[in-house]
From Swiss-Prot:
A Gene Ontology cellular-component term: cytoplasm
Provenance organism: Shigella boydii serotype 4 (strain Sb227)
Cofactor annotation: a divalent metal cation
Lineage: Bacteria, Pseudomonadati, Pseudomonadota, Gammaproteobacteria, Enterobacterales
CDD domains from the UniProt entry: NUDIX_Ap4A_hydrolase_plant_like (cd03671)
Motif segment (Nudix box): 38-59
Record's protein name: RNA pyrophosphohydrolase
Pfam families to which the protein is assigned, alphabetical: NUDIX
Length: 176
């Protein structure tokens, strides 16, 4: 489903842990990394598409995450000309995306790259919050910067409310 301007409706997903790190996924068989994302099917809401893509791409279900925020507006990026499929009609020149910020509430063990015939990702890792903005492919960089800027205060408040681990190796005075 391509809109009149040539953009495909899509959802993007930022998954964070309690430490404020974000899940960074490696595209199958490539050296490029990105956040999970995928198209919105006809008749599907952005939230429904997000949960479907979440399960299809990283094996997480609704019970594994909590929605913390979503972008106020649709964000767009254009594909480089070399990636546009000119032989398809209508021609898709880019993506318009609604982004969701999710907190992982289950454990890391629940994350698994599905073994379908066409998996999207073949690996993942936790990275610092701003790392993806510098590392994503250049044509997505502006959207990533805007998404991370919009979600930053939510993630930072999450970190502030997370209890810090006790320093169990602290020096103790002997009473004598």
């Amino acid at each position: 489903m391509i809109d009149d301007d040539g953009y495909r409706p899509n959802v993007g997903i930022v998954i964070c842990n309690r430490q404020g790190q974000v899940m960074w996924a490696r595209r199958f068989g490539q050296h490029s990394w990105q956040f999970p994302q995928g198209g919105i099917n006809p008749g599907e809401s952005a939230e429904q598409a997000m949960y479907r893509e979440l399960f299809e791409e990283v094996g997480l279900s609704r019970k594994d995450v909590r929605i913390l925020a979503s972008t106020r507006n649709w964000l767009r990026y254009k594909l480089p000309k070399r990636l546009v499929r000119w032989d398809t009609k209508p021609v898709c020149i880019g993506q318009k995306q609604k982004w969701f910020l999710l907190q992982l509430v289950s454990g890391d063990a629940e994350i698994h790259m599905p073994t379908s015939s066409t998996p999207e990702f073949d690996g993942w890792r936790w990275v610092s919050y701003w790392y993806p903005v510098r590392q994503v492919v250049s044509f997505k960089r502006d959207v990533y910067r805007r998404v991370m800027k919009e979600f930053a205060s939510v993630v930072m408040s999450l970190q502030e409310n997370t209890p810090k681990p006790q320093n169990t190796s602290a020096y103790r005075r002997k009473r004598g």
